[in-house]
């Protein structure tokens, strides 16, 4: 028998269940396999979120809601974080009027890499070992006026190291503050799924798009971690209307991290 409870967080109501589903692997990336919509009640039924933490665009000023394990395994928060209707992906949505962290002026519905089944925050060096993130995702909505959105990134101790960033129809891979470091494509269409991949090793980060290496950047940071989701690069000062109907959105159908 399932035990159901209702969780209310910063104006969001989400159903939580003690039941959990085993997650199969498809094409090397943990994702769903033939489930119906009724079987993916939570995003964790679609993606393996064992070693992740979620930050939502809700909560108190400069103190957004964080969801950690084990709660994340049975958590959803429509429309910011939910399994899509066909159980094929997880929707991440961050509105321009969303709550931001103290270190950013932009809202996010985003996963942050963790370790030890979600107990501790991940932190690794680009000069020791090999660290890989593979994400299958699609940008599905952009904010008005400033249509900029980040879908995956490596973050360092103080700031982002490199990200996949969409500006209108132009998809870039960044290098620190150089937001236009490398143009991947200038005709990206919303809803188009692609594979983003970062491989960090030997003080370098290789960035791949659909299996092809696009660029390599140098980095010797020793406190890195992966992030993925919707990190909207707009707010109420530069995007109108200032409400929840103006947002950035990303759908993720597969995500995998490896360290060696």
PLM regions and their residue ranges:
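Secretory/extracellular carbohydrate-interaction modules
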Residues: 71-170
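Short, aromatic/His-centered strand-loop micro-motif at the edge of beta-sheets
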Residues: 172-195
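Short hydrophobic/aromatic-rich beta-strand segments that constitute the beta-sheet cores
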Residues: 92, 173-175, 207
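Secretory targeting and sorting signals
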Residues: 1-28
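Ligand-recognition surfaces built from glycine- and aromatic
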Residues: 38-59, 128-132, 144, 219-260
């Amino acid at each position: 028998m399932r035990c159901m409870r209702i969780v209310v967080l910063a104006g969001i109501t989400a159903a939580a269940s003690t039941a959990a589903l085993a997650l199969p692997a498809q094409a090397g990336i943990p994702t769903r396999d033939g489930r119906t919509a009724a079987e993916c009640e939570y995003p964790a039924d679609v993606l393996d979120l064992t070693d992740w933490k979620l930050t939502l665009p809700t909560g108190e000023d400069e103190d957004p809601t964080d969801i950690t394990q084990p709660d994340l395994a049975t958590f959803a928060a429509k429309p910011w974080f939910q399994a899509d209707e066909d159980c094929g992906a997880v929707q991440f949505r961050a509105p321009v009027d969303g709550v931001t962290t103290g270190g950013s002026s932009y809202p996010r519905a985003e996963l942050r890499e963790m370790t030890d089944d979600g107990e501790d925050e991940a932190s690794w060096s680009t000069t020791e070992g090999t660290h890989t993130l593979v994400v299958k995702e699609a940008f599905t909505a952009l904010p008005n006026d400033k249509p900029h959105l980040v879908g995956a990134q490596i973050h360092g101790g103080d700031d982002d190291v490199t990200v996949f960033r969409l500006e209108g129809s132009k998809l870039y891979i960044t290098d620190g503050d150089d937001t236009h470091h490398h143009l991947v494509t200038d005709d990206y269409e919303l809803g188009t799924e692609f594979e983003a991949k970062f491989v960090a090793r030997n003080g370098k980060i290789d960035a791949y798009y659909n299996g092809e290496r696009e660029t390599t950047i140098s980095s010797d940071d020793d406190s890195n971690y992966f992030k993925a989701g919707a990190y909207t690069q707009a707010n109420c000062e530069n995007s109108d209307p200032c409400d929840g109907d103006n947002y950035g959105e990303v759908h993720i159908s597969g995500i995998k991290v490896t360290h060696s």
